């Protein structure tokens, strides 16, 4: 019986030696094999943490899009001619970027009971790219003398690429977590 107790103490001391000190809000993660329930709990923690951080980033970026879109709409009221058209295209581009960032859209609409219109993130991105090209064309051909306005009109293009990258990053994290679920091994702790 004493041998068994010594063996248990050695095992328990080994497991405490091989724990990794994580953040203060997370439990210690052992590098010893995890049983299936512990694996599922760990994957659930990863999934929850990824979901929370994705929501935080998406909400912060959405606020940024709305604030900058509001600024562009204020500038639209004060401007004329080609600048007004470019600013309107930039504001609409920000709206499209915000929609594709926040939502996964696939809808079919019937127009006049004959035509079927499919609206998806891909089609919204195509419209967004057309708006960005229009805005860039106007800004480089007609607003060349005012560098501040040209720079102001390039921000929606930058925010479009930020939305694309954040969406891709979130999708990659989801794929990695799905791959992690496939890598679970069967281990029962006696």
From Swiss-Prot:
GO cellular component, one term: membrane
Keywords: Membrane, Transmembrane, Transmembrane helix
Keyword Oxidoreductase: no
Residues annotated as signal peptide: none
Transmembrane feature ranges: 56-76, 81-101, 124-144, 150-170
Disulfide bond annotation, renumbered to this chain: none
Topological domains, Cytoplasmic: 1-55, 102-123, 171-190
Chain ranges on the Extracellular side, renumbered to this chain: 77-80, 145-149
InterPro entries: UCP010056 (IPR016564)
Mode of membrane association: Multi-pass membrane protein
Compartments reported by the entry: Membrane
Predominant place of localization: membrane
Remaining remarks: Present with 238 molecules/cell in log phase SD medium.
Name this polypeptide is given: Uncharacterized membrane protein YGR016W
Naturally occurring in which organism (per UniProt): Saccharomyces cerevisiae (strain ATCC 204508 / S288c)
